[in-house]
């Protein structure tokens, strides 16, 4: 607080940067963000977590080792058989998981429309339950329906665990864990770029495995 008050006193001087209004406005913006961080409380809503990126949100993961992550919510669609990433989207505002499923499936459908592939079954975690009416024509399978699933569907549900290492590789090998682009548009471009890099590396491994190189 002492440094902020000292800077504010100097900015109120009549001779302070009269020929640089842009620099003054930028300085006022940083001072406003610093004051917001200084005065916010633990239980406040819409807290500011990063000076350089006010769009950063706190995401509760529910894991003992890492209960919270800071950034923007992302959703990934992975193919069942080969593990290719069919869609990657960001959702500012930290919406409920079930409300983003239709948007993610729309992106995956647009990407695969030239392959004459129709997405009929969706295997997801419990966060996507209760949204069947919002996704007509799609069979949503999750472990909340385990007792009513067929043996084949139970196998699909076990196969769904393969998406977790795919997300881990996106974060560790393709730099999805930290976005260096600015704003919501930068977050969206970063997610798509990481997914494209993942698929390119998958394709290079397939070429080497089949001896086509």
PLM regions and their residue ranges:
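Polybasic low-complexity intrinsically disordered regions
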Residues: 1-120, 124-126, 133, 197
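Composition- and surface-driven signal marking solvent-exposed, interaction-prone regions
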Residues: 88-91, 135-136, 181-184, 207-212
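Hydrophobic (often cysteine-bearing) scaffold residues that line and stabilize catalytic clefts
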Residues: 97, 101, 159, 189-192
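Helix-centered, glycine/charged polyanion-binding patches within enzymatic domains
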Residues: 113-189
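A short, flexible helix-boundary coil/loop motif
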Residues: 172-173, 177-179, 202-213
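Charge-patterned, long linear interaction tracts outside catalytic cores
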Residues: 194-201
């Amino acid at each position: 607080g002492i440094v902020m008050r000292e800077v504010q006193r100097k900015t109120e001087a009549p001779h302070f940067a009269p020929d640089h209004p842009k620099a003054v406005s930028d300085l006022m913006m940083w001072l406003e963000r610093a004051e917001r961080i200084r005065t916010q409380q633990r239980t406040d809503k819409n807290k500011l977590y990063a000076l350089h990126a006010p769009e950063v949100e706190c995401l509760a993961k529910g894991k003992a080792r890492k209960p919270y992550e800071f950034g923007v919510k992302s959703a990934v669609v992975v193919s069942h058989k080969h593990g290719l990433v069919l869609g990657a989207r960001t959702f500012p505002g930290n919406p409920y998981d079930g409300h983003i499923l239709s948007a993610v499936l729309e992106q995956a459908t647009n990407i695969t429309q030239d392959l004459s592939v129709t997405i009929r079954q969706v295997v997801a975690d419990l966060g996507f339950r209760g949204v069947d009416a919002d996704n007509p024509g799609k069979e949503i399978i999750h472990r909340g329906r385990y007792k009513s699933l067929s043996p084949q569907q139970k196998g699909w549900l076990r196969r769904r665990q393969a998406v977790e290492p795919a997300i881990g590789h996106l974060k560790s090998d393709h730099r999805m864990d930290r976005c260096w682009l600015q704003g919501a548009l930068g977050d969206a471009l970063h997610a798509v770029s990481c997914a494209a890099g993942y698929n390119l590396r998958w394709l290079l491994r397939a070429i080497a495995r089949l001896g086509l190189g």
